[in-house]
């Protein structure tokens, strides 16, 4: 039998280890038919092993890989209090569609459909970065299903000027060049903007591995997701949300600066609170996992910040 880490891909080896970690935490991956054209892969606890009285919590990842990559430091603490659902967004991990829809609204609709197919009628939601855009739309469209919302490091209120400044910080001309990197320089710039202390300088073969195995499979479609997101921001007025919302941000976010968190809070009004974590950047849940998780639990369990 072939090993899961063949062809000397450190990315694939790491992904395999992270999958084992999730399994050790009691999660299993399901493939759910969201609609006739779309399948959603989702890590969750088997229903026969979980207390049905626990509230459900949906965790929506960003562009830094599938759900397998992003929540390892939160699972142990969150699983004590929630039935967890970690879906892969469409074109990430094992989720796929033949549909031509690319908007964050489509992503939200597919996640909602997958949750319904799994028998989950109501849930809390937490989304980070691109996942925060999806969580926002999910909470707006499916208000009767979504209870509380946490949005992390998501530039939902970006203006054209904010976009220009992001491109300048990332040394790119278009957004997909930064978030779907194809060059060594782009990978390094993305890490620089995402972490206060970026990982040590990577060897060339590791960067090549990241480019190929984290972004190579659906590169065209991933770029289209970002283009659709940017187009919708330019065309539509942003709705508000009726749910209680917690906004979490790193004070040194290099992707979406802290002023965007304050703008989002102002837009959402009295329903929203903001928690700023010091000495953290865009990947705040990875840089400050203990503080981040404590804030999340306090909000979901006690309405605190």
Language model regions located:
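Catalytic active-site module of serine/aspartate enzymes centered on a nucleophile-bearing elbow/loop
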Residues: 270-305
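Conserved alpha/beta-hydrolase catalytic His-Asp/Glu region
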Residues: 160-168, 178-242
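Alpha/beta-hydrolase fold catalytic core
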Residues: 1-57, 80-82, 301-305
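Short beta-strand/loop motif that positions the catalytic acidic residue
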Residues: 241-242, 247-249, 253
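Conserved HGGG/HGGXW glycine-rich cap/lid loop of the alpha/beta-hydrolase fold
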Residues: 44-96
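Conserved acidic catalytic loop of the alpha/beta-hydrolase fold
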Residues: 105-123
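Short alpha-helix in the alpha/beta-hydrolase fold that links the catalytic acid
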Residues: 243, 257-266
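Flexible "cap/lid" loop of the alpha/beta hydrolase fold
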Residues: 136-141, 145-182
